[in-house]
Amino acid sequence: LVGSEMLIRDRCRPVVSTMKLQKICYFVQGWHLVINGHPMFAEDFHAWKYGPVCPELYELSSGNALTDTDSVEFVDVSPRLNDYRQDFIKKIFGIYNPYSGLQLSDITRNHDAWKNAGTGTHKDSKDSLMSKESIHNDFITIMKSI
């Protein structure tokens, strides 16, 4: 997760909204599940009010709405992500980067994985877990429609 998050932040310099960062990581996870048959990272997403949120990523952002990427200490992600994974993230980022965080939020809240998980409001919402299987199923449906 940290490698994915750092690579996306680096591409969004100088500022990225936490919402946009969360949603792009969600799209990376969903497409990776469908195309490669396994998750990009182990962490789970939860159905929060404005769409999928990975609590661990939320903690990395310190709960801030905006992240000044110039104040973030960047690390070399190559030990965490091989070339294939880095390229995969860059491709998904390229598709979804033109959208705002709110637009991405609207898209993700139309997914069954979000609708069926319940809607939590904070990291302690146990009933809001979006299973990787339900995310996978949503992205299979999306892939079949394109």
Task: Please report, for each region that a protein language model flagged, where it lies by residue.
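Domain-edge interaction signal
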Residues: 4-5, 9-146
